[in-house]
Amino acid sequence: MRTIDDLGELRGKTVLVRSDFNVPLDGTTITDDGRIRAALPTLKRLVDAGAKVVVTAHLGRPKGAPDPAFSLAPVAQRLGALLGTPVALAADVVGPSAHETVAALSDGDVALLENVRFDPRESSKDDAERLELARAFAELADAFVSDGFGVVHRKQASVYDVATLLPHAAGDLVLAEVTALRKATDDPERPYAVVLGGSKVSDKLGVIANLLTKADTLLIGGGMVFTFLAAQGHQVGKSLLEEDQIDTVKGYLDQAEQSGVTIVLPTDIVAAEAFAADAPHQVVAADAIPADSIGLDIGPESGEAFAAVIRGAKTVVWNGPMGVFEFDAFAAGTRAVAQGLTDATAAGAFTIVGGGDSAAAVRSLGFDEAGFSHISTGGGASLEFLEGKTLPGLAVLED
């Protein structure tokens, strides 16, 4: 994979950088700037090299048209504060404002183009439409650096097509992500434990199938666990359940048994009367969830058991929270897993926190990011990497 060094002398050159600034917002306030901070090493490196840096990124899911609610204005402000230099924000993606903003840059300056998903060609399934937008990007720059790991699984104009038109390289963040994930997937030090959470089994089917041939232990929590419990014949009350996945999960349980992979499920659940922060709740056995209750976290016994398995592993990958960590009453399971990972890291294990929700949980629960070997910025991208899929935005950088 080509690196920034392979691009040669950059002073005076205009470099287009695809970053991942898809940060959570409360109105216009950024509630977690982790993805912006993760982009800083690459951007600072290009600034120090004297390049004119033009950043493109998306935020949220606007419907292919400008929408003030998804403007990158808060991102430009925060990025400027973190870089210690003003960041000019173009009022459009590749239009007159973008051209004026880029033309006004001096060596070492940084500009941000408006939300790339305001242009419907970015995510078009039509190759010609995407290429048209990519050509417009290429007119603005001399080289392209791909540094938005969270989008490398998408065949989009600013991720894939533009790399076919300009001298290109992987940014420092993308290189760090690929290096960390390869270490966990290609030749993991054993025991190798994978913790999977989040709401849906269907989002993790490919990952589970692939990991059943690689991991030593799979620990399952989050909303997806109720489909596993149902597959074992248990009643799960009003908990999240994907009935159409029960047979698939039964197959995974059988396959795990045959291949010697241990699947660890919670033995107790925090069950609530409703999905609410202040809902009355109780700890119940995982096979005795009341019919009128909804499971919102793994229980304390399970949290301790999961953490013990994690502490005994040499490689740990965690993707997805154990419960509704945004509500204090249902955050203990996620906190126990996070603590287990930091303990394992301190004991010399290689640990990866993957997925947007897991990374957000780690930060919101007050854990020091330095307590983990690697915190991935890619949700879907890291999942597809763990599945063993070819990611278009990475494959194009090999050419």
Curated annotation (Swiss-Prot):
Subcellular location: Cytoplasm
Gene Ontology biological process terms, A to Z: gluconeogenesis; glycolytic process
SUPFAM superfamilies according to UniProt: Phosphoglycerate kinase
A Gene Ontology cellular-component term: cytosol
Top enzyme category: transferase
The keyword Ribosomal protein belongs to this UniProt entry's keyword annotation: no
Similarity comment: family membership: Belongs to the phosphoglycerate kinase family.
Descriptive protein name: Phosphoglycerate kinase
Organism this protein belongs to: Beutenbergia cavernae (strain ATCC BAA-8 / DSM 12333 / CCUG 43141 / JCM 11478 / NBRC 16432 / NCIMB 13614 / HKI 0122)
